[in-house]
């Protein structure tokens, strides 16, 4: 992406049709300079349902979407374990990528993704909505008024009663750290604007 698209809408492809897509589309539908061109999923049936629900013009396979020259960027809303593979395929095809959080299930995956983005000179971003949340920007504006930040305490949680959910399955990259802990880590880094010197962790 760049100067070549400054005078037209950014054309998006949905590379997946996961549950989070419904919430993402509520925001996307309010943005004037983006156009959802097509949707792809593991099954054509799932993609077709999404296309009908959100009036998306085309239903494609993953391969068809990545070969399309009229798609500038793809959004990847699939389970955590599939993020890296799809993101790298998209970037190798010359597409910019917005991938749901966590972008990778470990730092090694993220490093591979960023290396791929640099090699192919495309945009790569992890979709963390709190990064642009108005309240966060307001907090940042007042940090200088309170002096040096010495302690940051965060809590981000929700109730989950489905013990069979992938969120509870470590073999499917489940667990609180990858699902919601990323918000606490992003917030802390935004506030401190520094890399950690060392990390102490615990679990039970």
Residue locations for each model-derived region?
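Short catalytic-loop micro-motif centered on adjacent basic/acidic residues
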Residues: 97-100, 124-127, 200
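N-terminal Rossmann-like dinucleotide-binding module
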Residues: 2-54
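Short active-site oxyanion
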Residues: 11, 34-38, 72-74, 124, ...
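Predominantly a Rossmann-like dinucleotide-binding segment in NAD(P)-dependent oxidoreductases
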Residues: 130-201
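Rossmann-fold dehydrogenase core element
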Residues: 111-129, 148-154
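Beta-loop-alpha module in the N-terminal Rossmann-like domain of NAD(P)-dependent dehydrogenases
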Residues: 54-116
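Alpha-helical elements of Rossmann-like donor-binding domains used by nucleotide-donor carbohydrate transfer enzymes
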Residues: 23, 49, 64, 73, ...
